[in-house]
């Protein structure tokens, strides 16, 4: 058997950075030895398989613009650490998904003339992609629209890779409320979302009265604040590993609009109400949500405009029953479903694998 080359995967932070990197790693692990680089304070080590040779750096992520002077110093110091790692592990190629760990990794790789691929999941590119992307051999895009922001980069549209469970059908978990009412999945991303939790809490009586079945992923940090006793039609969880099954089998998703969520909804062809996080960098969550809203598969509600009345009126409109030829259906919901089916889907991890494996010919 020929000796494998070494791939460094640099990914840390939220699920939006980590899950695409995990999907790609799994896809290429037969051809590459995977080494994972993350930030100790910004990575759940339990998510990374032991075989991926995890290495973490003790770096404090900047709270503000990474291009303030003192941040240059931090990046410089981190770069020296990463150069040492790249040499020790004899890395042949670097793949990263953005975030603070990416900047020094890209610089270190460029100094050592190691090829670099970065994947950008959001419509509006993050600061690392925007300012360091030109140093990379390829900038892979989750959305075609991102190309207009990166004129000086070698960009290729690949889509965003998802967790494996989204590429197969999953049965609804037994613990989900039973009944004939529409099933809502309410979630706020890996960090939880206080505003979404609050509006659901305020509207819970209305939802149960209307016979909605609700699975509420509240997020660990908000579990105590928004704890509501589970009932026949309402289940609250801080986290679940069965998110693909829930999304695939529900009627509507209510969520933030991180890039990962948008792509999961597209893969599952599932309608949604999207409430973008208003403080996301470059307002990227709203730009993400606009992709699905423009297609007619989602209703976009800005958090500043959100209220109990707006939320309940939106649900009533989506789930308004209309009789047609003696048959009752949700006309608006059915139209949203049809619009989601028309969204182009791409097997992203296969596309990304092609560009990673391209470099095998170079070694």
From Swiss-Prot:
Belongs to the glycosyltransferase 28 family. MurG subfamily. Cell wall formation. Catalyzes the transfer of a GlcNAc subunit on undecaprenyl-pyrophosphoryl-MurNAc-pentapeptide (lipid intermediate I) to form undecaprenyl-pyrophosphoryl-MurNAc-(pentapeptide)GlcNAc (lipid intermediate II). It is found in: Cell inner membrane. One of its GO terms (cellular component) is plasma membrane. Keywords: Cell cycle, Cell division, Cell inner membrane, Cell membrane, Cell shape, Cell wall biogenesis/degradation, Glycosyltransferase, Membrane, Peptidoglycan synthesis, Transferase. It catalyses: di-trans,octa-cis-undecaprenyl diphospho-N-acetyl-alpha-D-muramoyl-L-alanyl-D-glutamyl-meso-2,6-diaminopimeloyl-D-alanyl-D-alanine + UDP-N-acetyl-alpha-D-glucosamine = di-trans,octa-cis-undecaprenyl diphospho-[N-acetyl-alpha-D-glucosaminyl-(1->4)]-N-acetyl-alpha-D-muramoyl-L-alanyl-D-glutamyl-meso-2,6-diaminopimeloyl-D-alanyl-D-alanine + UDP + H(+). One of its GO terms (biological process) is lipid glycosylation. GO terms for molecular function: UDP-N-acetyl-D-glucosamine:N-acetylmuramoyl-L-alanyl-D-glutamyl-meso-2,6-diaminopimelyl-D-alanyl-D-alanine-diphosphoundecaprenol 4-beta-N-acetylglucosaminlytransferase activity; undecaprenyldiphospho-muramoylpentapeptide beta-N-acetylglucosaminyltransferase activity. Its EC number is 2.4.1.227. This is UDP-N-acetylglucosamine--N-acetylmuramyl-(pentapeptide) pyrophosphoryl-undecaprenol N-acetylglucosamine transferase. The lineage of its organism: Bacteria, Bacillati, Cyanobacteriota, Cyanophyceae, Synechococcales. UDP-N-acetyl-alpha-D-glucosamine binds at residues 14-16, 122, 163, 190, 285. It is a peripheral membrane protein. It is an enzyme of class 2 (transferase). Its main location: membrane. InterPro entries: GlcNAc_MurG, Glyco_trans_28_C, GlycoTrans_28_N. Pathway: Cell wall biogenesis; peptidoglycan biosynthesis. NCBIfam families: murG. It comes from the Bacteria. It comes from Prochlorococcus marinus (strain AS9601). CDD domains: GT28_MurG.
């Amino acid at each position: 058997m020929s000796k494998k080359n070494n791939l460094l995967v640099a990914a840390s932070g939220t699920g939006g950075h980590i899950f695409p990197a995990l999907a790609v790693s799994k896809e290429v692990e037969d051809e590459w030895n995977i080494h994972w680089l993350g930030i100790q304070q910004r990575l759940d080590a339990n998510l990374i398989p032991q075989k991926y040779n995890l290495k973490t750096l003790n770096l404090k992520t900047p709270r503000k613009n990474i291009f303030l002077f003192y941040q240059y110093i931090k990046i410089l110091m981190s770069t020296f650490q990463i150069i040492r790692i790249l040499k020790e592990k004899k890395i042949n190629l670097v793949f990263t998904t953005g975030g603070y760990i990416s900047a020094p990794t890209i610089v270190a790789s460029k100094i050592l003339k190691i090829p670099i691929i970065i994947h950008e999941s959001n419509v509006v590119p993050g600061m690392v992609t925007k300012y360091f992307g030109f140093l990379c051999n390829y900038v892979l895009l989750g959305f075609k629209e991102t190309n207009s922001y990166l004129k000086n980069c070698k960009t290729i549209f690949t889509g965003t890779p998802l967790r494996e469970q989204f590429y197969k059908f999953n049965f609804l978990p037994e613990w989900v409320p039973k009944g004939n009412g529409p099933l809502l999945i309410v979630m706020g991303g890996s960090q939880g979302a206080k505003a979404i939790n609050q509006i659901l809490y305020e509207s819970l009586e209305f939802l149960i009265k209307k016979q909605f079945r609700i699975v509420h992923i509240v997020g660990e940090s908000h579990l105590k604040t928004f704890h509501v006793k589970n009932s026949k039609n309402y289940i609250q969880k801080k986290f679940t590993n069965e998110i693909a099954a829930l999304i695939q089998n529900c009627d509507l998703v209510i969520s933030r609009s991180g890039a990962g969520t948008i792509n999961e909804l597209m893969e599952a062809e599932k309608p949604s109400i999207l409430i973008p996080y208003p403080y996301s960098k470059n307002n990227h969550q709203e730009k993400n949500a606009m992709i699905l809203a423009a297609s007619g598969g989602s209703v976009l509600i800005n958090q500043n405009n959100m209220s109990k009345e707006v939320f309940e009126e939106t649900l009533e409109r989506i789930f308004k029953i209309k009789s047609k030829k003696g048959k009752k259906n949700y006309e608006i919901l059915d139209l949203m479903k049809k619009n989601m089916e028309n969204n182009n889907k791409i097997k992203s991890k296969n596309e990304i694998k092609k560009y990673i494996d391209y470099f095998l010919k170079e070694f």
